Amino acid sequence: MTKTERYLQLRSMIPEMRRIKRIHFVGIGGAGMGGIAEVLVNEGYVVSGSDIAQNAVTDRLCLLGAKIHIGHGADNVQQADVVVVSTAINPENPEIIAAKELRIPIVRRAEMLAELMRYRHGVAIAGTHGKTTTTSLIASLYGQAGRDPTFVIGGLLNSAGTNARLGTSRYLIAEADESDASFLHLQPMVSVVTNIEADHMDTYGGDFEKLKSTFVDFLHNLPFYGVAVVCIDDAVVREIMPRIGRHMITYGFSDDADVQALNFQQQGHQCRFTVRRKGKEDLDLLLNLPGQHNVLNALAAIAVATEDEIDDSAIIQALAEFQGIGRRFQHLGKFATPKGEVMLVDDYGHHPSEVAATIKAARAGWPDKRLVMAYQPHRYTRTRDLYEDFIEVLSQVDCLLLLEVYSAGEAPIPGADGRALCRSIRLRGQLDPIFIASPDQLAEVLPDVLQEGDLLLTQGAGNIGALSRQLAASELGFSTAATTEVKP
């Protein structure tokens, strides 16, 4: 089949969209927006987009043939048939205003994802934590089984070198975003819920019951013959299960899970465990990821794959050979310092539960190492709403370098900034954190902090990920390096 024939076949899956030729993305540099744009470029659409800065996502889209504008302007949308907008974009953005004046349809990211999913076998992964890893594991499993899925993920799948890919099969595996409740646009065949915690509460008016009900509604978007795969270990998920009127498969470490993990052991970056499934043989598995939280993510993938009759051999191989996701406990190398060798790991987790899971994985895999964390809080509202939880979890490391809050466009909130959080942790009495007012100062502080054998963990959803890579490239700012193993 030629490339043109493949485009025509894929385009025919959504025949009404053949009237649409030019699609413009406002905020195209985000992982979610860029992933959908990449799929559409490869389907043969003329894709353009704008963002305030160039990044790896925009660079990749340029190479694929998309037209990228750095900066927003009314002229960018003049030729568009439809405009896709990120939730981070202000309604007063000149491109949004121009699209309205020109009567160009404006859709949210999740609406476009829903159109891609409409005539495919959709697998949607939702939950407060673990979405990206679970989506990546499912995509890897289906790929290993020869199913060649389309996928859209919120992080870089290392084995593919991208966060999105257009496959040739009917499968679409995608992360479902609850942050703005837009995941309610999706109508998949299989839905996964990893866990439910209080986050993005501004979307839900501060009402946790509303958040829980929204997850129930998400699961009821499944057809009556669809499947809900849910983590029974999560107390809130277990609580809402009686309200779910769809076929359910549960997973977890709990004795009553349909897909259960047993005999968990962690050694360094890898975990071993046995999976028990109803009506199937037990499997002894090696997972090339650290931590019990990642075993839960793997169980979700196993449950989805088993339900779709994917062979056990593909499950075994995909989990053992999984190459990880960018910024999810990503090992960036080992570096020499004047006081000895230090290991550098970078992680995206920015909710207290995510930080706790990362710390637990680090302690389990490297129990003899001193844990030094450089943490950058993400959003003033999250810091305010989960302030006491942050104090508790950040007090669990051996040494804390606390950066100022990454605002993500929010206005500062008194008492919810990095300096206040640092002071509160110090008053707790377990730790004497070091406040880092500017990210540029981190490299200056490290020589006085790091000791031989330390595990340096950079943590957060802001620009600390880029900072961590700068540190790796400069060998933590020291002139001599030990064996450096920077991984993609």
Curated annotation (Swiss-Prot):
| Subcellular location per the Swiss-Prot or TrEMBL entry | Cytoplasm
Q: What class of enzyme is it?
A: ligase
In terms of one coarse class, where is the protein primarily found? cytoplasm
- Give me the residues that bind ATP, please: G127, T128, H129, G130, K131, T132, T133
Reaction(s) catalysed (UniProt annotation): UDP-N-acetyl-alpha-D-muramate + L-alanine + ATP = UDP-N-acetyl-alpha-D-muramoyl-L-alanine + ADP + phosphate + H(+)
InterPro entries to which the protein is assigned, alphabetical: Mur-like_cat_sf, Mur_ligase_C, Mur_ligase_C_dom_sf, Mur_ligase_cen, Mur_ligase_N, MurCDEF_pg_biosynth, UDP-N-AcMur_Ala_ligase_MurC
| Name of protein | UDP-N-acetylmuramate--L-alanine ligase
Species this chain originates from: Shewanella sp. (strain MR-4)
